[in-house]
Swiss-Prot record:
Protein name: Probable cytochrome P450 516A1
Regions that span the bilayer: 1-21
Underlying gene: cyp516A1
Membrane topology field: Single-pass membrane protein
Keywords: Heme, Iron, Membrane, Metal-binding, Monooxygenase, Oxidoreductase, Transmembrane, Transmembrane helix
Pfam families hit by this protein: p450
Superkingdom in the source lineage: Eukaryota
Length: 487
């Protein structure tokens, strides 16, 4: 009897939900269309595997603004550049906040930069933007990235001389982590597994936990059965936080002795907070969580883009040869390149942009929440809805990009390229656009540029590498091995 009653209640709620979400006419609001969702799971049966590709298929049926349900979370997916501008730029006061769930609250406690909202986020965003701006003017910072890119190139040498294959993705992760650690704390780790910094294992474990964490966010009831995963995430985050806390203490002690000795981003953070009119607003918890955010997000995004770029250059050896020739001309035959030569390498720059376009690591962006009803063309996005930018869908739009699924750097060199600014947003758009985007481009340019000057890369078996990838905390390549020849 109880089961029958529950079934009837679920059926009634399901019918009410269907009618509630149908588009309305007349004086009533019109909601974005979308596929029928099921009780409890929503549209997860359609989205669970490769959600960026699944949404792409649904988009062709329901349009560039559609509603889907991640379990019971109403989500509006936007795949149109004009609507993106309307929603995230023109109405940024309604769409700047993050959609927060269990995992994001554990990571940020609403006191970091990725997963905080309101005035708190605005204050830290301002400090971060000012610090990054001053960082770019600091000569020693550029030298740190350049030297790290040389060390990355040296890390490949053993594989070239021994004839052993190597998974470049793991070396790229070490490179991007070292760049962030150098810029943030003036620390670095060895590329040798035996000499690696203990924080590296903790960061890897956090990444693994986050993949399962998404499931716990959608179905909180599973926390009862997956307590170990949550505990594992917290324990590894504690290691990252402790490392950041120790570094903050170390930097403060140094600045007390010599306030003028600015070596890195953390020094700039501490100084900017002192100069801020809201200095009493910032506490140590916020500072160590912001620093930890940079370690977590800055490492994965740039390393994934480097892995994609090398993959496409291996699958297109003529492009790889052309890039190498251009780099050698720019350096006058030298085997190292710096940022001063960046303006001399238009084709290589185009390859970087094309990798960012064709495989954006933030394929579906970090979700926002509509803090009020939001207008999106003829539709209304209701208050409380989750909103996602379909970055991948924008990049695959055949009305904007000719042959969008083909890696073609020449599209960026064409004089008649006229796509909307919001058709290419690998670093997001609006008030939450990535403040470290220029830095990321520089680290990709130097890292890939210096290895291409020293080695020829081929796939392990001479066949093209799988270009599909997989969807995790970022859109990543499958692990692949390469052969390399020293030049």
């Amino acid at each position: 009897m109880i089961i029958l009653l529950l079934s009837i209640i679920i059926f009634i709620l399901y019918i009410v939900k269907i009618f509630k979400n149908k588009s309305c006419c007349g004086n009533e609001i019109i909601l974005p269309p979308g596929p029928i969702s099921l009780p409890f799971i929503g549209n997860l049966h359609q989205l669970a595997i490769d959600p960026h590709l699944a949404i792409q298929k649904l988009m062709f049926k329901y349009g560039n603004v559609m509603t889907v349900y991640f379990a019971n979370i109403k989500t509006v997916v936007i795949s149109d550049p004009n609507y993106l501008k309307e929603v995230f730029v023109n109405q940024s006061h309604k769409t700047s906040d993050r959609y927060l769930m269990g995992t994001s609250r554990i990571i940020g406690n609403e006191k970091d930069i990725l997963f905080s909202n309101g005035q708190y986020w605005k204050n830290y965003r301002q400090i971060l933007a000012q610090s990054f701006l001053k960082l770019r003017d600091h000569k020693g910072i550029t030298e740190k990235i350049s030297l790290e890119s040389v060390k990355l190139s040296q890390a490949f040498e053993w594989y070239a001389t021994s004839g052993q294959v190597v998974n470049p993705c793991s070396l790229f992760k070490m490179y991007t982590l070292n760049v962030i650690m150098q810029l943030l704390y003036s620390h670095r780790s060895s590329y040798d597994l035996k000499g690696q910094h203990p924080i590296i294992d903790a960061l890897k474990m956090v990444e693994e936990s986050l993949a399962v964490g998404n499931v716990l966010d959608l179905f909180p009831i599973l926390n009862i059965f997956l307590k170990k995963n949550k505990l594992k995430l917290v324990n590894n985050l504690q290691q990252v936080w402790s490392y950041s806390q120790d570094s903050i203490k170390e930097h403060r002690e140094k600045l007390l002795i010599n306030p003028e000795k600015i070596d890195d981003l953390l020094d700039l953070f501490i100084n900017e907070i002192k100069l801020s009119k809201n200095s009493e607003f910032f506490d140590d918890e916020g500072l160590y969580r912001v620093c930890s955010d940079l370690l977590l997000s800055g490492t994965e995004t740039s390393s994934s883009t480097m892995s994609w770029l090398l993959l496409f250059l291996i699958n297109n050896p003529n492009f790889q040869d052309k890039v190498r020739t251009e780099l050698l001309e720019a350096t006058g035959g030298k085997k190292t390149i710096g940022l001063t030569e960046k303006s001399k390498t238009p084709f290589f720059n185009a390859c970087i942009k094309e990798a960012l376009r064709i495989r954006p690591v933030g394929a579906l962006s970090l979700p926002r929440i509509a803090s009020e009803d939001v207008t999106c063309g003829p539709y209304t996005i209701e208050k409380g809805s989750q909103i996602i930018m379909n970055v991948y869908g924008l990049a695959m739009d055949p009305t904007v990009w000719e042959d969008p699924e083909t890696f073609n750097p020449y599209r960026w060199l064409s004089s008649d390229i006229s796509q909307s600014t919001y058709s290419f947003i690998p670093f997001g758009c609006g008030s939450r656009v990535c403040v470290g985007s220029s830095l990321a481009r520089d680290e990709i340019f130097l890292g890939i540029g210096n290895i291409l000057l020293n080695y020829i890369f081929e796939s392990q078996n001479g066949k093209p590498i799988n270009e599909k990838g997989h969807f995790g905390i970022a859109l990543q390549t499958v692990d692949y091995n390469v052969k390399l020849t020293k030049i």
